[in-house]
Amino acid sequence: MRKIKQWLAAAGTVLAVAAIAQPARADELSDIIKRGELRVAVQTSGPLMSFMDKSGKRTGLAVEVAKRMADDLGVKLVLQDYEWKGLIPALLSGKADMVAADMTPTPQRAAQVLFSAPMFYADTVAVVPKDSPYKSYAELNKDGVTVGALGASTYAEVGKKMLPKATLKEFSG
């Protein structure tokens, strides 16, 4: 049967960006200022939020917000590249001061970290080639259809719930 790559782009719930942080304490902020740098964990490849432009420079919405925060603090920005699954561990281990990513604040994540106010809200969508025979979620929810989503993400969770008959393939990002 025909397989397609299906990207579930956005989770329909809040996508919080840029200020996932441990409880903000005065000593942590003073440590950042004394150190002279804000260490920010970003996705190695998270287009729109964090990616390399054609000149090889890291950019994206989350990166630009992190730059602004470092500028406001008067410190150097140090971006640290991680795969998706390494973002929260980098924060919890103290390697990073914050995470800048499009991360939905799930109960499991909120039990470990604090989230900023959301920068935007997004609906869940499916993306298929223009000439695809699939025109609805119902048509994708069939045996023999393979969909893809970012592993360990709310995209994957939405895919499992909305397309239980399809095969979900999770990708790192």
Report the location of each language-model feature:
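Extracytoplasmic small-molecule ligand-binding "clamshell" domains
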Residues: 27-102
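Ligand-binding "clamshell"
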Residues: 107-118, 164-166
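Flexible hinge/capping segments at coil-to-helix
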Residues: 129-146
